């Protein structure tokens, strides 16, 4: 009789936050146990699991998973990993945590506590991360922080794609840059170009002034921005308002198009 092993209840709560994709469901392949110092069975503890201890290593396709101890549910192609958990995909993606439940059939990894995803110069920190190997997206839902070479971005909900290098932030978004702080409701961010796309009510605060906007983009490298939908730029006693504002924070110069007003 087949035994069905589902993710622990604490992991199911995030299912509704999963980002919908148009990708074909992943082809089912086997998870293999590569190494363990000891292997045992205990029907009183986990009747359907191989109990593994010491230098445990699994392989699933091109991904490797390491931990100190694990339960391996071979019948359902899944595993639970404990302590010093590490996932490696190629030589560019590394994910660490204290706990992992991995479903080899769906290729979804549920990592909990002290989770860190490293992808080149981008590092994601959270305590709850669900990582879908197909289509290669990690998402968090209890607060997270993404750090690159220039900015620190945090939010309550978020996701990051190691393939596209794009990050999405929702709810209590904050961007910390050496020259400014951005507060927003919804923000997309390209970790390569360092351009933030603003998609909700936002405030950008710097020594040179304050910007209020709900739509546009901000180039955090060149400190230039395009602000739409009657955005407002405040600098000293001056307030600039317009349908479209191209603003250079370094020079303090702004070009306004449509329904412009300047309060001095």
Predicted regions and their residues:
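N-terminal amphipathic/hydrophobic interface segments
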Residues: 1-264
């Amino acid at each position: 009789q087949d035994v069905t092993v589902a993710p622990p209840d604490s992991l199911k709560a995030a299912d509704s936050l999963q980002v919908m994709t148009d990708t074909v469901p992943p082809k089912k392949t086997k998870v293999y146990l590569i190494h363990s110092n000891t292997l045992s069975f205990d029907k009183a503890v986990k009747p359907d699991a191989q109990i593994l201890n010491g230098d445990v290593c699994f392989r699933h396709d091109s991904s490797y998973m390491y931990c100190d101890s694990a339960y391996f549910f071979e019948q359902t192609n899944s595993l639970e990993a404990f302590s010093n958990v590490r996932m490696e995909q190629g030589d560019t993606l590394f994910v660490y945590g204290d706990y992992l439940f991995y479903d080899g059939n769906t290729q979804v990894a549920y990592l909990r506590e002290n989770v860190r995803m490293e992808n080149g110069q981008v590092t994601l920190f959270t305590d709850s991360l669900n990582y879908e190997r197909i289509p290669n997206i990690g998402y968090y839902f209890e607060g997270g922080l993404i750090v690159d070479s220039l900015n620190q971005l945090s939010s309550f909900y978020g996701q990051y794609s190691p393939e596209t290098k794009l990050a999405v932030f929702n709810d209590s978004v904050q961007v910390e840059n050496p020259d400014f702080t951005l507060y927003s409701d919804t923000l997309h961010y390209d970790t390569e170009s360092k351009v933030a796309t603003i998609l909700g009510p936002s405030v950008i605060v710097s020594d040179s002034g304050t910007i209020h906007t709900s739509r546009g983009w901000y180039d955090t490298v060149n400190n230039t921005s395009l602000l739409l939908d009657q955005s407002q730029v405040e600098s000293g006693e001056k307030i600039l308002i317009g349908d479209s504002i191209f603003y250079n924070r370094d020079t303090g110069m702004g070009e306004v198009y449509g329904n412009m007003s300047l309060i001095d």
